[in-house]
């Protein structure tokens, strides 16, 4: 019997039901090069070299985080290196990124990205840096450790996500934790059921934005002077009940405690923050995971190569 090599880095490409397989750190690059818009690329755990995304494909990893609650895989899917998103305007497909960890820069640089979905992933910095049109980006169950900027005239919605800070664009936030509220003074945004931290105490909420059932942690007593409803609550930054929420760290879960969960209710009567609403935060990807992929070190006598694959379902 042949001995088996260690588990390999692997990417599978699904094109209309036909599966192609690629191996090693360049597997994502090779799969993307072979893909067409609408195809699905699934990555195993491990670190892959990133690639500029020029097609509206789905890229699914094994997860952005591994915790004791998530024992399906042993490590996340990491994309190494900065990359651009430059999908031609005539490509009407939907770009989806799920279950990945990225600690570099992502730029919307060319073409058009419409109705893209970033799901259950951890990003560092996402920005628009060129002529790219970003329309109706959805960020769901994600973490952004530094910032996101889609620029004026572009749009994004954030659902049950942790965002350190954001800059320009028409944005809506529901059940989010915003750790640096410097840009809540931007007009035209919407905030519902969020926890919003203002440690500087220097911002004032825009009269052209809307806010419902948000907890603001701020020393600025005039923060909400232009908000016509009384559904929001402001507490000072010295309030020890919420001190643990300040600052970004990948190890933080940003959960409300029994002590502060009932300080303010969401619009549906439930919990504010990322664990409330109909899409509570979870780092576990929705797609099945490749948990084992072993390849024999040599072929059999008849020239065949033994492969051992194990797949488990995600959420």
Predicted features along the sequence, with ranges:
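Predominantly extracellular beta-rich ligand-binding scaffolds that present long acidic/polar faces
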Residues: 106-110, 126-252
């Amino acid at each position: 019997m042949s001995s088996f090599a260690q588990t390999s880095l692997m990417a599978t490409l699904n094109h209309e039901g036909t599966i192609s397989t690629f191996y090693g750190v360049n597997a994502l690059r090779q799969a993307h090069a072979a893909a067409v818009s609408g195809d699905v690329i699934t990555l195993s755990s491990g670190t892959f070299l990133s690639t500029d995304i020029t097609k509206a494909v789905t890229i699914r990893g094994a997860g952005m985080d591994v915790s004791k609650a998530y024992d399906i895989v042993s490590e996340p899917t990491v994309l190494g290196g900065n990359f651009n998103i430059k999908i031609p305007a005539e490509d009407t497909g939907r770009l989806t990124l799920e279950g990945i960890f990225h600690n570099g820069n992502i730029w919307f640089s060319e073409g058009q990205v419409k109705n893209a979905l970033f799901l259950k992933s951890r990003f560092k910095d996402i920005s628009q840096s060129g002529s790219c049109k970003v329309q109706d980006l959805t960020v769901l169950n994600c973490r952004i450790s530094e910032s996101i900027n889609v620029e004026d005239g572009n749009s994004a919605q954030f659902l049950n996500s942790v965002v350190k800070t954001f800059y320009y664009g028409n944005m809506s936030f529901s059940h989010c934790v915003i750790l640096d509220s410097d840009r809540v003074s931007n007009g035209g945004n919407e905030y519902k059921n969020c926890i919003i931290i203002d440690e500087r105490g220097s911002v004032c909420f825009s009269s052209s934005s809307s806010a419902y059932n948000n907890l603001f942690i701020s020393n600025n007593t005039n923060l909400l002077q232009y908000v016509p409803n009384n559904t929001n609550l402001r507490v000072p930054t010295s309030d020890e009940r919420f001190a643990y929420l300040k600052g970004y760290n990948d190890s933080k879960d940003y959960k409300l405690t029994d002590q502060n969960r009932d300080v303010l209710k969401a619009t549906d009567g439930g919990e504010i923050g990322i664990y409330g609403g109909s899409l509570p935060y979870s780092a576990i990807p929705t797609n099945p995971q490749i948990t084992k992929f072993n390849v024999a070190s040599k072929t059999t006598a008849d020239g065949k190569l033994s492969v051992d694959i194990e797949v488990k379902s995600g959420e």
